[in-house]
A protein has these predicted regions:
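Short, well-structured N-terminal submotif of metal-dependent ribonuclease cores
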Residues: 1-37, 47-58, 129, 135
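Short, flexible loop segments at the rims of nucleotide/cofactor-binding pockets, characterized by
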Residues: 12-16, 44, 87-91
Length: 135
């Protein structure tokens, strides 16, 4: 199973000129092992669609399994946010990336993303599939 970050799906859904091809290729490579997202990713990609039905249809078409966020992941997200604040992070509430990274860690699955910095810093045990790592 591969956890897919919202930026990768937004590339595809919004026909991003720079990243759509890479994102489609990586999703296609990961598809045989299964793909998943959570409600946070669902919320972030929703702005690309006119209706909830459209979002859900696109998610189903992409064969993405929507996983509930377990309490263990919520706790890990909070712990990551505490470290972020200690590192002088400016945001006052937990960032979506913390819920995404923590969920991938709890599931012990790789995370497909174009934005590896925060994930690598706060979830170093999560294998990242990125433009640099993918080659």
């Amino acid at each position: 199973m591969t956890f897919v970050d919202s930026c990768v799906l937004i590339d595809i859904f919004n026909d991003d000129a720079q990243w759509k091809s890479w994102s489609i290729d990586q999703v296609s490579r990961a598809l045989p092992r299964g793909l998943c997202i959570n409600a946070v990713v669902y919320a972030e990609v929703s702005s690309s669609f006119a209706t909830q039905h459209d979002v859900t249809t696109a998610i189903k078409h992409g064969r993405l399994d929507i996983k509930d966020i377990p309490m263990e992941a919520a706790y890990l997200a909070a712990e990551a946010f505490k470290r972020y604040r200690l590192n002088k992070g400016q945001f006052k509430t937990a960032l979506p990336d913390f819920f995404i990274g923590a969920h991938a860690q709890v599931l012990s699955c790789p995370l497909l993303t174009r934005d590896p910095q925060r994930f690598a810093t706060y979830f170093p045990d999560v294998q990242l599939i990125t433009p640099t790592a993918a080659g």
